[in-house]
């Protein structure tokens, strides 16, 4: 099996809920990331064999967002495209499927990524199609129905984090301290321009004219432990999960161009990283946040890759309690973990995140000349996924 490489890795800035990107559809944002990824890769659009994009909140976004992104990005209409929904891991699964297609010889160059507009998730009228005759009817929030609530666990996502906090004896203070670290690291990274190389600016047409959006807008640089401590628990009066120690509801897109070793050599291209291994695992839906643990353990069991082999680790911060539960089991080196902050500060645009953390990981590996890195995340419904990279620059 020949090696599979990432040629480019790009993302939009992440917009807060109802913020700068709220007017754009998931497809709109995906096109921006995809065009930038193609341009930076050195690949022509007509050299792409397939387009694969993750998108988790699909209601109202039009059919097959990946196909919309592909055609609008200049990829020929003869090139197929499909959309992946693996909830939080959708964007990472898109990369995994690109990797598998190339490894099997079904493709030599694939455009992959993830995109999400959480701001545009619609409300639902469940029975309106057949008519309301008598009685009270409810307006259903699509964000709750298709995201926050897990029908397997019969719980909302934050309640699963409370389960982990109780099981692993994770205090509110620990969670708030971790959340503050995420905010401070992200603020330092933004101030130092560490995300600039991975971001494709977004031009937005508004009532006051054209504006260029080029910085993540969800972080709170003035966060403090005192401010975090004042926030009430969300899911139970005696709970520990707050808006401050949870990931943000946000919008964004990210994309990569993936290619075979033969294609890279044939076209004299300069890859950024080699995809070393990808794993996925299932866990109890009630403790879905522990999913990265078996996913990372599979890297060791199947590929002999141990945690200490990775100079950098990007673990999506769905909740501080969730990440800290994983830390209780695996004992991460905190100096290698989410070095520029994570989803608590930056946000978690669901279908985008799996690609976003891969993009951020790769760029930080290049800056630090880190040989190997791993991106991993938990997945609603009770799963985990991990993707290991090797720097080849």
Language-model features: locations:
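Short glycine/threonine-rich loop-to-helix capping motif typified by GTGT followed
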Residues: 59-64, 211, 215, 285-292, ...
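Active-site pocket-lining segment
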Residues: 159-162, 195-198, 206, 276-345
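Condensing-enzyme catalytic core mediating Claisen C-C bond formation in acyl metabolism
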Residues: 1-24, 36, 225-290, 294, ...
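Flexible glycine-/small-residue-enriched beta->alpha junction loops
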Residues: 109-163, 167
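Active-site nucleophile and cofactor-binding loops and adjacent substrate-binding regions
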Residues: 81-90, 245-249, 275, 288, ...
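N-terminal extracellular/periplasmic Venus flytrap/periplasmic-binding protein-like
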Residues: 11-12, 22-24, 29-32, 40, ...
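Active-site-proximal alpha-helical scaffold in enzymes
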Residues: 85-116, 159, 165-194, 255-262, ...
